[in-house]
Structure formats: structure tokens, C-alpha cells
Amino acid sequence: MDRFHIQGPTTLKGEVVISGAKNSALPILFATLLTSEPVEIYNVPKLKDIDTAIKLLNQLGAQVEHQNIIVFSDTSKVHACCAPYDLVKSIRASIWILGPLVARFGYGKVWFPGGCSIGKRLVDLHIKGLKKLGAKIILGEEYVIASVNGRLQGAHIVMDKISVGATVTIMSAATLARGITIIDNAAREPEVIDTANFLIMLGTNIIGAGSNRIIIEGTQKLKGGRYCIIPDRIETGTFLVAAAISRSHVICLRSNPNILKCVLRKLRESGADINTGKDWISLNMHGRRPKAIKICTKPYPGFPTDMQAQFTLLNVVAIGVGKVIETIFENRFMHVPELIRMGARVQILNNTIICHGVDTLIGTRVVSTDLRASVSLVLAGCIAEGLTIIDQVNHVDRGYDNIERKLQNMGAHIQRITDK
């Protein structure tokens, strides 16, 4: 398994080009199963999870190819409706394949997904939604089967809790259902809107994506077409934090400030000077150390849980005492013990992290445990004194396109070591 060797401290600064949003690309890739016509998807990031999703689709009989930032997908010859275990176990987003399979083919079998180890990440909301649409569900210990005779049937679905994943599953399946589907208490994330816009491009009618009520008018057949994925707001936020903890400056190109308002507000609160344009964001600390802040993770448009670990690091090296409250996932503080090994002064009280800011971190050997925790350790290694070794960096590869090259361009001394 690969590891990073990072020699610090370095000042991270300069320009970075933001990749397409992983959390849009994955559901959109799986949603290509809804149509038998060719689809071209632009601005698709080069990620381990994307590669796995493409392998999964190809094993079902699809013809999917990733060239640079473009994916060409043709699912007209899909001959299997069971997602193979060896691929599903490594990517939790694989549950998104179930809705399109049952909607178009009347049958889908998916092994319970793997990926990150941050909490339970239950799929019950996906299953409840498909049941409401008329799917018959069989639950095994490690798999779920969804089937329907004929077409799914539109329904009024009130989500028990806000869930991006379940909103996408229901919305995708409903595109081929008979009649109208209404989703209340729907997730409002930009990636939900992006997926909805892709489905609209395929020929379905969706109203209200981005609000807590989404209305989908099902159709019998969808067409093909071309679509461009939005920039990754979490990658954008990560590089903004990289400059903030370096007390330096960065310009994030091909980004969208309109989908990052809460993060930008908190960065300004920490002392950052931020300017924005239509497709760029600049941050400048003017050599100042950031000020400690309070954040509380909430569903969009609140503070994103996927930025929690990065802002924990910001508070670790900030002036004063900062507080981080995690309300979305349990067990998402696995980066904290590793930061403490690097010299952080941090306490965990239930779902809250209290950070007493320190001026300097010290390089050491740490282990990455999940995607966002891992990237916080990478950034910590860049500003720490001495050598930091980060094991199990495959987690970072799941969500960040070419991160070492982008950090090297910003001044980091980071090297990937591959064990033979």
C-alpha cells in the first residue's frame, strides 16, 4: 500500500485548477444505466472511486471509457444486473447503481458497499424509497435485491432524515417510473442539483432540485447527450485551507464560489481575505496566522461535514481556542489522535472537538483512516517541522485528483512511496 513522505515545513501557495465533483460524477456515471443511448460526461476527475465505478459498469456489459476528463458511456449492451462483490466492497457509492438497474431492467442486486469507515452509513433510506416506488426488496446479510414487474410507480416520499445518497437514488429511479414522484425533506446539496440537471438532459422533467421538495415526472425512455460536471467544492475548500494554514495565498481556478458560501464565510471569520469571480476564488492571509473559529456541520447550505477535518486542522494551528461540532456522522474524528501525535492540543467531548491552537506541528509517522481525515494529515505534514510519513494513502486517492502533483505545484515537498 502506498504512503506519502512529506518534508516540512513548506508554504503552500500559488494557483490550483479544481477538478470535477466526485460526489456528482459517481451518481451521474451510474445514472447512465437509465438510457440505452450514448452519453458523454465532461470534467470527470481521475480518482480511484471513479475507476472502480467504471470497472463495475463494464462488468455489467456497458462500454465505458475514461479519456482525460471525458467519460464515454454506452450501456445499450448491459447483460447483467448484479454488481460484483469484489468491486462493490471498495466503494460505498455503489448503492447508487441499484435504482437505475431496477428502474430500467426491473432487477438489481448490490452487495452492501464498502469505502470509508466513518460511521454506519446505513442504506435503509435508499431501500425505503425504492419500496415506496413499488420495488420488491429482498435483504440478505450482505446484499440487497430490488425487483419490479413492469415499471416502478411514482409516489409521495417523505424522507425520515435528509440524505444526499437516498435523494439521488430515489430521484434517479423515479425518472423511469410511471407518473409523478414527490420527494419531501430532500437533500439540497449542489451535487443533487447537478445529478438532477444530468437527468433533465437525458429527457426527464425534474422541478425543485436544490429545495427540500423535488418533483420528478417519469418517462418511458430516456435519450443520450453531453453533460459537464460542476467543480468539486470540497477539493476547492481543501486547497483554500491549505493556504490559510500556511499563512499564504492561493487562487482556485475552475471553481464555483456560489456553492461554497458557508466555507468562505468561515474562512473570512478566521482572518482570510477572500475575493471571488465567476469561476475562481482567491484567498490571502497576508502572512497572518488564522484565528480559531467555531463550526458545526449541517446539511447544505450549512457547513459541509466533508470539510470538518480540514477545519479541525485550521483550528489546531490557529490563535485561540476553536470548536468543531460534528452532527452528520458519528466516528468522524479519527484524524484527531494522529494530529495529537504531531503536537496538536485537542480534546474530544462527545461530538465536539476543542482545539487549543499551537504555533508549530512536528512531523511523525501517522496513519490515514478515511478520505477527509487523510487529506487533513497530508496538509498537516506540509506545514509540520521535519519528516511526516503517512501510511495507507489509498484513502486520499479515492477523492483527490492528482493531489501530490497539485501540492507540489504549490510548493510542497511530497513524495509517493509504493511498496513492491
Swiss-Prot record:
Q: Tell me the SUPFAM superfamilies matching this sequence.
A: EPT/RTPC-like
Question: Which GO terms are recorded in the biological process aspect for this UniProt protein?
Answer: cell division; cell wall organization; peptidoglycan biosynthetic process; regulation of cell shape; UDP-N-acetylgalactosamine biosynthetic process
Cited CDD domains:
UdpNAET
Q: What class of enzyme is it?
A: transferase
Superkingdom, taxonomy of origin: Bacteria
Q: Which reaction does it catalyse?
A: phosphoenolpyruvate + UDP-N-acetyl-alpha-D-glucosamine = UDP-N-acetyl-3-O-(1-carboxyvinyl)-alpha-D-glucosamine + phosphate
Looking up PANTHER family in the UniProt record yields: UDP-N-ACETYLGLUCOSAMINE 1-CARBOXYVINYLTRANSFERASE
Any idea what this protein is called? UDP-N-acetylglucosamine 1-carboxyvinyltransferase
Q: Can you name the source organism?
A: Blochmanniella floridana
Taxonomy, top ranks, is: Bacteria, Pseudomonadati, Pseudomonadota, Gammaproteobacteria, Enterobacterales
